[in-house]
A protein has these predicted regions:
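Contiguous, well-folded functional domains in the mature portion of proteins
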Residues: 1-289
Length: 289
């Protein structure tokens, strides 16, 4: 790996000393304000800066959004993201870019070139889950500020468990993924465990700096409030939540990362997926073995 510059070192160092929680709380407060013309001006400037395509949004006019949060989790027009109908295929859960993907080497996942992190740490030291996914497959998808920020199901699934894991709020952009050790295993996250025809699948919504909230369609907003301990919910019998392939399952209010885990021998990651590959929700993510 090439050495990083002085300014890049400062950028990394700032992540460790900045008041992550307070910055995120401030961003969340600002994003939910309804300030009329000022809000519309900020939304328009943001869309221009990040070259956001509003033609696929259900509401194309900036003036149709009362707050920045409404804009950020804007729904798309019907059929803007067709769902691959191959019954042996899993589809991408979100728009974004592939941060990393491939084989889980025993208990190790690749975070960035030359940097690994622990499956056990990622799964909040849940021993049963860790054993379930050892030597399995994974895909990490980074959602940039310009991307659509609702998260969908790669396949039909029945929710069995949800785990909220408190943690840091480092930025998760590709540069910092290369320079902050154990980034995804130290950030705040929501772990969702599903039974599927492709075996047990986990979909993890990872928080980040100024990701003011993470929510799911069955539980609503998970955070805030933020907690200092791991919280777990189980869903059995009539309380089990059933979701269909392509159905929305959650969202971020400001960008972050989705990590998918699959059991060993169940799926093969799609051949076209590689690091920094742009993906759209609904495209092929993996195929049943």
């Amino acid at each position: 790996m090439n050495p990083i510059s002085y300014w890049q070192r400062l950028k990394v160092a700032f992540q460790y000393v900045m008041p992550q929680i307070y910055m995120t709380q401030a961003a969340g407060w600002l994003a939910k304000q309804k300030w009329g013309a000022m809000t519309h001006f900020v939304i328009k400037a943001f869309a221009k800066k990040y070259n956001i395509d509003m033609s696929i949004a259900e509401k194309e006019k900036f003036s149709d959004y009362a707050s920045f949060n409404e804009f950020f989790i804007r729904p798309l027009k019907e059929n803007a993201r067709p769902i691959n109908q191959n019954p042996t295929a899993l589809c991408c859960p979100a728009d974004g870019r592939v941060s990393e993907c491939g084989h889980i080497e025993d208990d190790r996942l690749l975070q960035a070139k030359g940097h690994f992190f622990s499956l056990n740490d990622l799964l909040a030291e849940d021993k049963d889950l860790t054993e379930t996914f050892k030597n399995g497959e994974f895909v990490t998808t980074y959602l940039s500020p310009r991307d659509y920020h609702r998260v969908h199901m790669p396949c039909d699934g029945t929710l069995r468990k949800m785990i909220y894991v408190p943690g840091d709020l480092f930025s998760v952009n590709p540069f910092l993924a290369k320079h902050v050790p154990n980034l995804f295993a130290r950030n705040e996250r929501v772990i969702c465990v599903f039974d599927t025809e492709f075996g047990t699948m986990v979909q993890i919504l990872v928080g980040a700096t100024i990701t003011a909230s993470i929510g799911t369609v069955w539980a609503g907003v998970i955070n805030p409030p933020r907690h200092n301990e791991v919280k777990e919910w189980t869903y059995e019998g009539e309380s089990a939540v059933k979701l269909s392939k392509g159905q929305e399952m959650g969202w971020f209010q400001l960008g972050s990362t989705v990590i998918n885990l699959f059991q060993a021998g169940q799926v093969q990651i799609a051949d076209h997926l590689s690091v920094d590959e742009p993906v759209r929700m609904g495209e092929i993510l993996a195929l049943k073995k």
